[in-house]
Amino acid sequence: MPELPEVETVRKGLEKLLNDFYIERIEVLKERSIASNGGSKSFIVSVKNSYLGSWERRGKYLIGSLLTKEKFSKGFLVVHLRMTGQFKLLEKEVLACKHTRVRFFDERGRELRFIDIRNFGQMWHVPSSRSIPEIVSGIKRLGPEPFSDDFNSHYLEEYLKKKTRSIKSALLDQETVAGVGNIYADETLFDAGINPKKESRNLKSTELKRLCNSLVKILNISIGEGGTTFSDFRDLEGINGNYGGQAWVYRRSGKNCKKCGEKILREKICGRSTHWCPNCQK
């Protein structure tokens, strides 16, 4: 599943390449891709005849502003890529591939195509008269952004002080911190030198400070590399993310730790495959 760095990479691409994209026509090939009330018919009526304006990211959600030709607000287009969703910009209309779910066409004949192999990705139209969390309920439950002032060791200490679950489980919970998934939870815990099985409430203040610093560091490095591609992720221009080759532990089970030489372990923690070094992470 695309995590914060991959979604941020897509956000940057959407903002860079679509600043003059006026949606003239929409085709919805898979009804379940549209999650807002009224289904695809209402979605098409609401979103077409709009400019795609600026793009923001909240956790793993993409939020695009919709504007009239006079640059008045028409609300927002909200997208969650889920497991395998990706956007592709085509300079001219070509035959839809098997996993194409939604197609947006502009006045110049360009196509913004949403492709989703697993078909879990979703889109919402949020009218300007409503708040985004009213329509997209998942956004209500998100914790602070890792790069925000609200995310710090004091916040984590207070939030986790009664949590008996593992710190790996806590990091994957979007209510703890928004946008972190399996890849960057593993990489962060390695960088911070923390055992992923350790109970959240038992982490010391010094460990929580390291955890915050490591998360921001790892995410920034991955964003700079365009995210991680292990299977389906591509940016808007079809380019793979490059962070995977730099991974310290993720998908390196059985290989030697790059720091100490110990074998990297892989085991299930909170139902997720977890990669870690038993020597470096205490």
Swiss-Prot record:
Record keyword Hydrolase present: yes
Binding site for DNA: 99, 118, 163
Cofactor: Zn(2+)
MF terms (GO), sorted A to Z: 8-oxo-7,8-dihydroguanine DNA N-glycosylase activity; class I DNA-(apurinic or apyrimidinic site) endonuclease activity; damaged DNA binding; zinc ion binding
Catalysed reaction equations from the record: Hydrolysis of DNA containing ring-opened 7-methylguanine residues, releasing 2,6-diamino-4-hydroxy-5-(N-methyl)formamidopyrimidine; 2'-deoxyribonucleotide-(2'-deoxyribose 5'-phosphate)-2'-deoxyribonucleotide-DNA = a 3'-end 2'-deoxyribonucleotide-(2,3-dehydro-2,3-deoxyribose 5'-phosphate)-DNA + a 5'-end 5'-phospho-2'-deoxyribonucleoside-DNA + H(+)
Entry note: cofactor: Binds 1 zinc ion per subunit.
Chain ranges of zinc fingers (FPG-type): 248-282
EC number: 3.2.2.23, 4.2.99.18
Keyword Chloroplast belongs to the record: no
CDD domains xref list: EcFpg-like_N
Pfam families listed in its UniProt record: Fapy_DNA_glyco, H2TH, zf-FPG_IleRS
Record key words, sorted: DNA damage, DNA repair, DNA-binding, Glycosidase, Hydrolase, Lyase, Metal-binding, Multifunctional enzyme, Zinc, Zinc-finger
SUPFAM superfamilies: Glucocorticoid receptor-like (DNA-binding domain), N-terminal domain of MutM-like DNA repair proteins, S13-like H2TH domain
Entry's Gene Ontology BP terms: base-excision repair
Family membership noted in the UniProt record: Belongs to the FPG family.
Role according to the record: Involved in base excision repair of DNA damaged by oxidation or by mutagenic agents. Acts as a DNA glycosylase that recognizes and removes damaged bases. Has a preference for oxidized purines, such as 7,8-dihydro-8-oxoguanine (8-oxoG). Has AP (apurinic/apyrimidinic) lyase activity and introduces nicks in the DNA strand. Cleaves the DNA backbone by beta-delta elimination to generate a single-strand break at the site of the removed base with both 3'- and 5'-phosphates.
HAMAP family registered for this protein in UniProt: Fapy_DNA_glycosyl
Known partners and oligomeric status: Monomer.
Protein name, UniProt field: Formamidopyrimidine-DNA glycosylase
Species per Swiss-Prot/TrEMBL record: Prochlorococcus marinus (strain NATL2A)
Lineage, broadest ranks: Bacteria, Bacillati, Cyanobacteriota, Cyanophyceae, Synechococcales
Gene that this polypeptide is encoded by: mutM
